């Protein structure tokens, strides 16, 4: 009951959808309403998240900084670009992340290996059954502060909705948001124990 009360107080939209089984207050059913724009703050708990695009889909790199006790996360878009080659991704990652840790989409092992060979500190996220919903719930539990110049993140936050008012998110407007999920799963759930996953 304490958990339910805390959810109702801190995240009423999550309470409405998950606890009461209702549709969120937003007319378009956006999944994340727990965000504002503001200045990016670098905290001790920080890494980058990356989602790989295919053809016209964007490859994204997002800087993510978390204050776990305060349940706040700061996110900043480094790039969100379609049609990138492996060398393009390596060059951009080096420019923005340097040798900092990048937690990435695990669907492209060959690409990840090539990025590692290029000198990047990159690891695939570990996905398990139900990873999308649990990852969404994790992000919903935090106040998201979005860098005001992160246009792709803001666009996706305004358009990422539940499919058919159900329990599955639509599979679009999610390239920056998936990158944020990967980074948060590592920083919040797995960093201290040496493992990371989206449960």
What are these regions (language model features)?
Residues 62, 70-171, 190, 196-199:
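Mg2+-dependent endonuclease catalytic cores in nucleic-acid-processing enzymes, primarily RNase H-like
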């Amino acid at each position: 009951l304490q958990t339910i009360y805390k959810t109702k107080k801190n995240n009423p939209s999550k309470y409405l959808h998950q606890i009461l089984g209702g549709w969120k207050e937003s007319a378009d059913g956006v999944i994340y309403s727990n965000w504002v724009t503001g200045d990016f703050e670098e905290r001790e708990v920080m890494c980058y998240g990356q989602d790989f695009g295919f053809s016209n889909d964007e490859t994204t790199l997002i800087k993510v900084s978390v204050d776990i006790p305060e349940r706040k996360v700061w996110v900043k878009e480094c790039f969100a670009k379609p049609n990138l080659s492996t060398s393009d991704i390596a060059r951009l990652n080096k420019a923005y992340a340097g040798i900092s840790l990048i937690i990435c989409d695990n669907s492209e092992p060959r690409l990840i290996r090539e990025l590692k060979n290029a000198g990047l500190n990159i690891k695939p996220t570990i996905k398990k059954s139900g990873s999308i919903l649990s990852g969404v719930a994790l992000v919903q539990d935090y106040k998201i502060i979005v860098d005001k110049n992160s246009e792709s993140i803001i666009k996706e936050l305004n358009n990422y909705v539940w499919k058919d008012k159900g329990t599955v998110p639509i599979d679009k407007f999610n390239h920056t948001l998936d990158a944020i999920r990967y980074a948060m799963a590592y920083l919040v759930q797995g960093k201290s124990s040496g493992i990371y996953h989206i449960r």
